[in-house]
Amino acid sequence: MAVPKRRTSRWRRNQRRAQAFFAKLKSFNMVKCPNCGEFAMPHRACPYCGYYRDKQVLEV
C-alpha cells in the first residue's frame, strides 16, 4: 500500500485547504431579484422582499 515518503508540512496542508475555501467563495453567483431589483442567491427567496417566483414566501 502506498504511504507518503515525507510528512506534509503545515504550510503545504494550509495551502491545499485555502484553495478549496477560495474556490467555494468564487462559486457563489448572485442574480437580480425580479421583484425588488436587489441581488440575491439563485433558486432561493429574496432576503430583502421575501419573494420567490412571483410569490411571497417570507414576511419581511
From Swiss-Prot:
One GO cellular component term, please give it.
large ribosomal subunit
Q: Which GO terms describe its molecular function?
A: structural constituent of ribosome
The reply to whether Nucleotidyltransferase figures as a keyword in the UniProt entry is: no
Listed under GO biological process in this entry are:
translation
Keywords, A to Z, come to: Ribonucleoprotein, Ribosomal protein
Record-linked SUPFAM superfamilies: Zn-binding ribosomal proteins (SSF57829)
Can you list the disulfide-bonded cysteine pairs?
A: none
Q: Which HAMAP family match?
A: Ribosomal_bL32
Which family does the entry's similarity section mention?
Answer: Belongs to the bacterial ribosomal protein bL32 family.
Show the PANTHER family listed in the entry. Answer: 50S RIBOSOMAL PROTEIN L32, LARGE RIBOSOMAL SUBUNIT PROTEIN BL32
* Database matches in NCBIfam families: rpmF_bact
Name it.
Large ribosomal subunit protein bL32
State the species of origin.
Hydrogenobaculum sp. (strain Y04AAS1)
Q: Which gene encodes it?
A: rpmF
